[in-house]
Design a protein with these regions (language model features):
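Terminal targeting signals and extreme-terminal segments of soluble enzymes
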Residues: 1-153
Length: 153
């Protein structure tokens, strides 16, 4: 949801298939092409993000490409801050990541995390991306709420 994309449309609830009960945003063409990425609210009210690793997510060595993990982390910033955003427009101001372990084709890649602080315009988030083998990446980032950009006709 980087780049001032519209969170205002709200996430779509998926009703069928592997991702039934999960949500996704349809308003970010890059993430739709890169993922698709999903999130849901857990029983304890926390947010969990996930996607299924495919061949197109791998690098030449057969491991998940670091750029894919960073893109998923960027998605997770917005999913983890979903409630604080309240359908506002926002952009990623910073995103830091530490790569810890690999993922392979077919893995379920998940993320959990938390909002560290939410102010009027800035939201600070941290999380961990993992698969069944353990942690893959830790990350932290900052989201800034912005006004939607006017469309020029």
């Amino acid at each position: 949801m980087d780049g001032g994309d519209d969170v205002a449309g709200g996430p779509r609830l998926i009703s069928v298939g592997e991702w039934a009960g999960w949500r996704c945003w349809d308003s970010d063409p890059f993430e739709n092409q890169s993922g698709p990425f999903h999130f849901r609210v857990e029983d304890d009210n926390s947010i969990r993000c996930a996607f299924r690793a495919e061949a197109r997510h791998m690098n030449g060595g057969g491991f998940m490409h670091g750029g894919c993990m960073m893109t998923f982390a960027d998605f997770a910033l917005f999913a983890l801050a979903w409630r604080e955003l309240r359908n506002d427009h926002a952009v990623t101001v910073s995103l830091n990541g530490e790569f810890i372990g690999p993922a392979h084709e077919g893995d379920l890649v998940e993320c959990t995390g938390e909002v560290v602080k939410a102010g009027r315009s800035m939201i600070f988030v941290r999380g961990v991306i993992f698969n069944e083998s353990g942690p893959m990446m830790s990350f932290s980032g900052v989201i800034k709420k912005v006004r939607p950009r006017q469309q020029i006709s």
